[in-house]
């Protein structure tokens, strides 16, 4: 999702949240500025749906709950005044119950595109790691089968690259193990062709 400056004037977090409730286009918010988000491709939507379905099945009857694209993540204000829309998040804290955002998610998934990859890998990776409850940040390529998992480890973070249809994404904290071919099911890549630019 590309970030496009909305206005030169800064707005407060409360003004941003109020505006998002009636906006036709979603915006992410960073330090007083709202940025319009570009639409997502069909493969982006398929990957998001596949992740959400796997999470929903794995978490049925459990405390944790998955949310897709319209649930924001609030970054701790000590780091930045920011609200992001991840593609998928998992929240496990029942007291984290604001209507439009979560402050203490356990997992965050972003499907990468050429327009968003730099922001997802840098800015958002740094911001999400400031959330003490985050166990993993999962970055999913959409034009080839590859997933990068940034996991909280002592001391710091570990990065794991998964490639190929037979590779498995393992998230033991929520009891999920899924083959990458399931994540890419019905996509251009799964049909054997590279996604068009």
Where are the predicted features?
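Gly/Pro/Ser/Thr-rich low-complexity, intrinsically disordered segments predominantly at protein N-termini
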Residues: 1-197
């Amino acid at each position: 999702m590309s970030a496009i400056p909305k206005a030169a004037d800064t707005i407060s977090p409360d003004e941003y949240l109020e505006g998002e409730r009636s906006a036709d286009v979603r915006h992410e918010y960073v330090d007083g500025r709202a940025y319009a988000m570009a639409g997502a491709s069909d493969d982006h939507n398929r990957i998001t749906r596949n992740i959400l379905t796997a999470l929903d099945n794995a978490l049925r009857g459990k405390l944790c709950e998955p949310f897709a694209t319209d649930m924001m993540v609030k970054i701790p204000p000590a780091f930045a005044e920011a609200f992001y829309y991840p593609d998928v998040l998992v929240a496990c804290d029942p007291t984290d119950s604001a209507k439009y955002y979560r402050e203490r998610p356990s997992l965050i998934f972003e499907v990468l595109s050429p327009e968003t990859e730099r922001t997802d890998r840098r800015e958002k990776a740094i911001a999400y790691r400031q959330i003490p409850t985050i166990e993993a940040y999962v970055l999913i390529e959409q034009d080839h089968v590859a997933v990068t998992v940034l996991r909280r480890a002592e001391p710091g973070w570990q990065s794991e690259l998964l490639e190929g249809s037979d590779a498995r994404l393992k998230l033991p904290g929520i009891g999920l193990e899924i083959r990458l071919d399931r994540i890419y099911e019905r996509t251009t890549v799964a049909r054997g062709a590279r996604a068009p630019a």
